[in-house]
Amino acid sequence: VAPRGGNASQDDVVRGLIARGFTVDQAAAVAANIKHESNYNPAAYNPAGGGIGAHGLFQLRGDRARAFQARYGKLPSQATLDEQLDFFASNDPEEARSRRAAFAGGGSAAQLGTAVSAKYERHGNVAEDLRRGQTAQAIAAQYNQQPQVGQQININGPVTVQANDPKELMGGIQRVGGATNYNSAVR
């Protein structure tokens, strides 16, 4: 969670969206739009438009900002990264409708980024929609080039592991932290 007034990172946004069930291409599409709207700043505020200005990562205005405020008791620009991503992923009628419209056509990160710009952000600038699509494609490419680690499983308590070859088992165990002893195995 980015500190108040501080920017989140692109990775915080992409990983946060993936954790909420979005694909890499969908997450990249949304992250690209957030980059162009607020440069990943959860506290971003623009006093113009919507009667109350534009707030937060998505620069929500008017009814959308008020719906956020009704749900969380504060405007988006006063909320955390997680609260804003939760709202994007929520079943709020307008958020869900806009999100479904943006993702309905499917496609590449570029196509989704363009669609999120046109159908979720709805600023009406076709050239900007395309630019955001290009940014989404670049984000997806960066993310897909990162080495992926398997699912991390945290285990507490005594554990008995049986393996035919303890050396192979040891190659698959990764020490995350602490003073856990991995030097015993039952054969």
Features from the language model and the residues they span:
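Acidic helix/loop microenvironments that form the catalytic cleft of cell-wall polysaccharide enzymes
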Residues: 34-38, 103-126
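G/A/S/T/P/Q/N-biased, glycine-rich low-complexity segments that form flexible N-terminal tails, linkers
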Residues: 1-7, 32-33, 48, 97, ...
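Peptidoglycan-targeting cell-wall enzymes and recognition modules
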Residues: 3-20, 28, 35-106
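Stable alpha-helical elements in mature extracytoplasmic
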Residues: 9-13, 26-30, 81-84, 88-91, ...
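Short, polar loop/linker segments at the starts of domains and inter-domain junctions
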Residues: 70-76, 130-132, 166-176
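A residue-level signal for beta-strand positions that form part of recognition/binding surfaces
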Residues: 57, 113, 152
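C-terminal, disordered and strongly charge-biased linear tails with low hydrophobicity
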Residues: 23, 144-187
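Long, amphipathic alpha-helical surface segments
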Residues: 123-144
